[in-house]
From Swiss-Prot:
Organism per entry: Chromohalobacter salexigens (strain ATCC BAA-138 / DSM 3043 / CIP 106854 / NCIMB 13768 / 1H11)
Protein's recorded name: 3-hydroxydecanoyl-[acyl-carrier-protein] dehydratase
GO BP: unsaturated fatty acid biosynthetic process
Subunit structure as annotated in this protein's UniProt entry: Homodimer.
Subcellular location: Cytoplasm
Residues annotated as the enzyme's active site: 70
Record flagged with keyword Isomerase: yes
């Protein structure tokens, strides 16, 4: 069977309900925490390290929920939501590869913010470069990622780590 290499919003919503990779396996969060509108490219090879690559997008419009509360009179998308989107994509990649378990963000190395996402922006692009997938008792994905707004790179994160757990009881 040929793997799908792009996903539209409806398919990402199916993933948030546990319907894309099967029960008990990787899920994306549901709206409002789903920070993606589409995955335009996902592959097992490619990226900076030749271990896989994802490119995803979020359409920006002024009525997104976070602009009302962060901050009143000075609306900006919280940087932590861009970071979370990168973790979401690393977990999505692990599920897409067919690995079992529920995803949990496990940390990252250095994160740099050099810009902001404002309500008048058009599109956010996430670019994930998989560095390693460890498949032992724990499935662990490690990646570097960037966030760009309207073509300008504004966040960088290295060593994004996401694990897949078949049981989260002792997590």
């Amino acid at each position: 069977m040929t793997k799908q290499h792009s996903f539209e919003r409806e398919e990402l919503l199916q993933c948030s309900q546990g319907e894309l990779f099967g029960p008990g396996n990787a899920q994306l969060p549901a709206p409002n925490m789903l920070m993606l509108d589409r995955v335009v490219r996902i592959c097992e090879e490619g990226g900076h390290y030749g271990k896989g690559e994802l490119i995803a997008e979020l359409d920006i419009h002024p009525d997104l929920w976070f602009f009302d509360c962060h901050f009143p009179g000075d609306p900006v998308m919280p940087g932590c939501l861009g970071l979370d989107a990168m973790w979401q994509l690393v977990g999505f990649h692990l599920g897409w590869l067919g690995h079992p378990g529920r995803g949990r963000a496990l940390g990252c190395g250095e994160v740099k913010f050099s810009g902001q996402i404002l309500p008048d922006a058009n599109k956010v692009t996430y670019h994930i470069h998989m560095k390693r997938v460890i498949t032992r008792r724990l499935i662990l994905g490690i990646a570097d990622g960037t966030v760009s707004v309207d073509g300008r790179e504004i966040y960088q994160a290295n060593d994004l780590r996401v694990g897949l757990f078949t049981s989260t009881a002792n997590f």
